[in-house]
Amino acid sequence: VLATTSFLEDIAQNIAPSSCTIQTIVPRGMDPHIYEPTPSDVELVNQSDLILMNGLRLEVWIDNLIDHSGKHGKKVVVSKGVNPIENESYENAPDPHAWMDLQLGKIYAQNTKQALVELIPEQKEEIEARYQEYIQEMDSLHQWALTSILEIPEENRVLITSHDAFQYFGKAYGLELHSVLGLSTDADVQTGDVLKISQLLQSRSIPAIFVESTINPKLLQQIAHDHNVSIGGQLYADALSNKEGPAPSYLSLFRHNISTIKRGLSAESSTSTSSAPDGVKWLSYGLIFAIMASLFITSYRKLS
């Protein structure tokens, strides 16, 4: 069984019987939005009996990879049944990050279970038992997440991150969401988005903002520095950490993120609602724009 991402691989490993081999295309720590398949990935596809993918335009490279492999085995979109959040800025661009709500993650698990039962029906009983145990863990973790977020002061329940991967998360657990980048990490940084974040931090006492594991943290670090706001920690969304890291599994990703967010947003804010002197403010914007230009040039060179 071949999963496109590390979190889908982990979900499958928790449900599949021990006799089933689960592998992933996008390695741990790597961004599936901008992943570039390798020749070894073609071989993985050729060896697979089943491919589990997120869908919702997360893996825009998958069809081309399958075409290159020449093998057209069974492909299952595990987000099937999710009512996606639509992107207001672009048509036909649903938010793919539905796994960031554990209740929707149960749909992923159910679709994975069904695909495994169809692949190896003789092991249906074991698959069903493992699935039920996993669902119970997800339900328990979901309730803990709800309780934990409620312990954050209400005025602090504002989550500012690198890219827009936490809309399902915020909707499920009661957080107001803002980000510098859009739904995909290959989007360009927009000046207006940076200014909105800066204005938000000037007008409200938000104690922390958060970087993400698969995205260059420089821009958010500069914004935090300019507004005397803490970096609350590193969150995981599009990929799991390595096995020795803080988010080696889908469920531990949630435990880590909730704990990190609660700790960061429960702290006393060191920001002041008064504006910085104009000279300092414009110097800050200049530094931010310089970082944006550097990131754009790096991306352009990579594409070239």
State where each predicted segment sits.
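Extracytoplasmic metal-acquisition and chelation regions
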Residues: 1-304
